[in-house]
C-alpha cells in the first residue's frame, strides 16, 4: 500500500511537471492555470444547470475519496457523496450532496427532471418516493438478470467509472476543490472529443 501511494504521488507530480513543460511555466503556475480552467468550466456548467431533462433518465449516487464505510443513504464518514442524473443519449448532471437520503435527493430530482419522465434507479430506499412524485419509476436489481434491456443504469455507472479513473491520478483532492474537479469530469463526458472540448474552452475563455 505504501508503495502504491508513493507511485500515485509520483504520477501526480509527473502530470503537473509535464503540463508545466508543455506550457513552459513553473509547475505551481501550471496548477494555477488548470484551476482557472476548471473555474471557467464550473461557471459555464452552472449557467446551464437549469436545463430540465425529460425522457428516459438514470439516477444514481456515488461516493468519492476512498473506500466507503457505513450505510448508503446516511452519507459516509470522510467521503464525498455525489448525486448524478443522466439523460439517456444525452448529458450527465452531477451535484455534491450531504447524504443520499430521500429528503436530500428528491428536491434535486424534481428541479432537474420533467414530470412524467421515465426514471431508472437501483433499489436504494431513498428513491421509493419517486413512485408517488409524478414520475414513471423503474427499479433495477443488480443481483438479478433482467430480460428488459432498457431496465438498467449502465450510463450513469459508466460515468462514475470514468470520473473515478480520471481523478485517481491526482492521489487525493481536498473537499473544497473537489466540486471543480467533478465538473471537469462532467465536462469531459458531455462535450465530445478532446478537440471539440478544446474548441469549447477557447470560446468560453475568449481566446
Regions found by a protein language model. Give the residues of each.
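Residue-level recognition of single "structural anchor" positions
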Residues: 1-207
